[in-house]
């Protein structure tokens, strides 16, 4: 008969197992400090990591132990302690007894400084390499995690500012193993799409190691080599990442990236109206000035002797005023029609409007379905409608031979 444990029984068994293994007690471990927090209670919580793994650590009453009080993110240390298992939460951690600094800067930061020096020497951070963002973008490319808050912030802010802009999304890992390659591939792929006006690559906030992919030299060079203008939009305020320095523009958050690059539709319309008012006033001022000048000439003795000439000039003034007014009204109406026509064309391309016309989009595992071979029986399928989503399970696939 199978043994079934309660959660408490299982955790108690694990703790007993760990406590009985000598190798889990009184050992040294070397790594880099991360996510460090000093508490007023006298306890110190942090992680220690290398290039592949990390483990949680705690030092209770650290002031009573041989533990430095100035440890910081990135410090390389040697730690002496024991494995601890917190039974109530099932947490596995190292209980630090002694910590010794191995280097003032962690290996990652030391490597980063070398890369910064190298790229600075090559002039890759210079303003002369920065490309300007387009004033009126129609299509934006985004490289970020498909399920992250960053993407939702970008979509929400774009729809609020100019809802007919199209967003091309390249889903990519933004932390962990393989993140660098996916970010680079995303930038390269979006650069090949002619319609895209500029690219945003980034993510929401996190610990420094979560953001570290954007500090890798290869990723920074992908930003620098982008043929299209590119914004580094990583959610952090403390320091500049390497991608911030090689990108054409840096934004502290994905939301700010949209605010920097996408104009507000209402502001554009207000600006157009203000320009219309300004041109109308300018025209009126010019006509009034001409009136005054000609009236002064009329009063001149020489012109008084030629009433026919004066009358002709007066009629010319009235005629020119009418012509100028009609020309200005025609010009303003033409520009307004051009602007409204462009807005209508952009709105037609909006995928949201396609949904409103009754069409749907189906996805399996966050990938769009184009043909039946993209799905399998019992796949969970999400169908996007104009007012929501439907989750269904594929029970049967029916191929239609008469469909081109």
From Swiss-Prot:
Keywords from the named record: Cytoplasm, Exonuclease, Hydrolase, Nuclease
Name listed for the protein in its UniProt record: Exodeoxyribonuclease 7 large subunit
PANTHER family membership: EXODEOXYRIBONUCLEASE 7 LARGE SUBUNIT
GO molecular function annotations of the record: exodeoxyribonuclease VII activity; nucleic acid binding
Lineage: superkingdom: Bacteria
Enzyme Commission number, as recorded: 3.1.11.6
Pfam family, one: tRNA_anti_2
Catalyses which reaction(s): Exonucleolytic cleavage in either 5'- to 3'- or 3'- to 5'-direction to yield nucleoside 5'-phosphates
CDD domains: ExoVII_LU_OBF
Alphabetical list of InterPro entries matching this protein: Exonuc_VII_L, Exonuc_VII_lsu_C, OB-fold_nuc-bd_dom
Localisation: Cytoplasm
Family the entry assigns: Belongs to the XseA family.
GO cellular component entries: cytoplasm; exodeoxyribonuclease VII complex
Top enzyme category: hydrolase
GO biological process: DNA catabolic process
Protein purpose: Bidirectionally degrades single-stranded DNA into large acid-insoluble oligonucleotides, which are then degraded further into small acid-soluble oligonucleotides.
Major subcellular site: cytoplasm
Subunit (UniProt): Heterooligomer composed of large and small subunits.
């Amino acid at each position: 008969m199978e043994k079934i444990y309660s959660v408490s029984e299982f955790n108690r068994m694990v703790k007993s197992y760990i406590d009985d293994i000598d190798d889990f007690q009184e050992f040294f471990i070397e790594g880099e400090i991360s996510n460090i927090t000093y508490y007023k209670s006298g306890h110190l919580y942090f992680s220690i990591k290398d290039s592949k793994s990390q483990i949680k650590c705690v030092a209770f009453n650290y002031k009573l132990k041989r533990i430095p009080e100035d440890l910081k993110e990135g410090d390389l240390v040697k730690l002496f302690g024991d494995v601890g298992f917190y039974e109530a939460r099932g947490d596995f951690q190292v209980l630090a007894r002694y910590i010794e600094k191995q280097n003032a800067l962690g290996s990652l930061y030391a490597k980063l400084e070398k890369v910064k020096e190298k790229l600075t020497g090559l002039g890759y951070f210079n303003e002369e390499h920065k490309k300007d963002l387009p004033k009126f973008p129609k299509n934006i490319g985004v490289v970020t995690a498909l399920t992250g808050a960053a993407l939702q912030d970008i979509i929400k802010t774009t729809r609020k500012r100019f809802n007919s802009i199209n967003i091309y999304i390249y889903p990519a890992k933004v932390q962990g193993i393989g993140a660098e390659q996916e970010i680079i591939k995303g930038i390269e792929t979006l650069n090949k799409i002619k319609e895209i006006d500029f690219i945003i690559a980034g993510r929401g906030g996190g610990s420094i190691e979560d953001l570290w992919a954007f500090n890798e030299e290869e990723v920074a060079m992908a930003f620098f080599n982008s043929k299209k203008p590119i914004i580094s939009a990583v959610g952090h305020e403390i320091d500049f990442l390497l991608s911030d320095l090689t990108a054409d523009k840096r934004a502290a958050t994905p939301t700010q990236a949209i605010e920097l690059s996408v104009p507000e539709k209402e502001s554009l319309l207000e600006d157009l109206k203000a320009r219309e008012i300004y041109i109308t006033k300018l025209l009126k001022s010019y006509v009034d000035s001409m009136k005054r000048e000609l009236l002064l000439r009329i009063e001149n003795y020489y012109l008084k002797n030629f009433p026919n000439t004066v009358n002709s000039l007066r009629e010319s003034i009235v005629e020119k005023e009418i012509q100028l007014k009609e020309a200005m009204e025609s010009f303003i109406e033409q520009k307004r029609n051009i602007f409204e026509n462009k807005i209508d064309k952009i709105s037609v391309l909006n995928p949201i409007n396609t949904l409103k016309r009754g069409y749907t989009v189906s996805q399996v595992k966050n990938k769009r379905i184009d043909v039946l071979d993209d799905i399998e029986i019992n796949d969970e399928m999400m169908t996007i409608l104009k007012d929501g989503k439907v989750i269904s399970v594929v029970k049967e696939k029916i191929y239609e031979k008469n469909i081109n």
